[in-house]
């Protein structure tokens, strides 16, 4: 558990191995050159490959943000970071005959509360208010079914192919990064790996994060994932202004 109680956004982060032998998730939280940077990565590939890939993702993100901010705009920093991460993992795979990959949802938050968000795969960023939940769109097979109206979000949580991704970092020479901009504006920022949002409904996530401080919210979200029979690694960051 990581908790910040100083000036600026109050945030906490927590990662749980769940029913797995190892934790292939990684996360980053920190202040970088006047911005707050948050990220969750969920590694793929097994046999420690995913653990390596997710760690590479958050380390290269931190390094790129430190080098580029504030001279370069946050959206462009995210684009460059994702390109570097993808290239680094792709090269690592070629050199070692591996198939490591990772998801990544990364957020750069400015002093005004504006959030720049980059996502590959199905790790997810949410902006939660007492009455609504906005979240990034998963790059996954079932998200395509939801978007086309074939199944509902509730049905997607039970779909047998819910873990099939259409994009991941490190598995191809090029990757499509989804970029978004949102205002935090009194809401709560929640970034999670799919061990949370594949098992815990949005209504429960909203109830927990709007009623609790970030530290307590993280603990209760992890507990909710376990109660929902999540056997996956689960990582969550909760931040509020």
Stretches found by the model and what they are:
Residues 1-241:
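PP2C/PPM-type serine/threonine phosphatase catalytic domain
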């Amino acid at each position: 558990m990581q908790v910040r109680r100083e000036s600026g956004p109050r945030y906490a982060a927590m990662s749980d191995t769940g029913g797995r032998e190892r934790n292939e998730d990684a996360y980053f939280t920190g202040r970088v050159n006047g911005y707050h940077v948050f990220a969750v990565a969920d590694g793929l590939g097994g046999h420690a490959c995913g653990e390596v890939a997710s760690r590479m993702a958050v380390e290269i993100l931190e390094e790129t943000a430190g080098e580029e901010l504030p001279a370069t705009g946050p959206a462009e920093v995210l684009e460059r970071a994702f390109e570097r991460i993808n290239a680094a993992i792709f090269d690592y795979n070629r050199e070692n005959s591996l198939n490591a990959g990772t998801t990544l949802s990364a957020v750069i938050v400015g002093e005004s509360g504006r959030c720049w968000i980059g996502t590959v795969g199905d790790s997810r960023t949410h902006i939660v208010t007492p009455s609504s939940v906005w979240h990034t769109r998963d790059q996954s097979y079932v998200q395509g079914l939801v978007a086309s109206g074939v199944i509902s979000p509730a049905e997607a949580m039970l779909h047998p192919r819910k873990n099939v991704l259409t994009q991941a970092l490190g598995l191809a020479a090029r990757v499509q990064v989804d970029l978004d901009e949102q205002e935090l504006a009194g809401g709560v920022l929640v970034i999670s790996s799919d061990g949370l949002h594949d098992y815990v409904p949005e209504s429960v996530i909203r109830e927990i994060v709007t009623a609790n401080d970030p530290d307590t919210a993280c603990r209760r979200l992890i507990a909710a994932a376990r109660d929902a029979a999540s056997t996956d690694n689960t990582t969550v960051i909760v931040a509020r202004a």
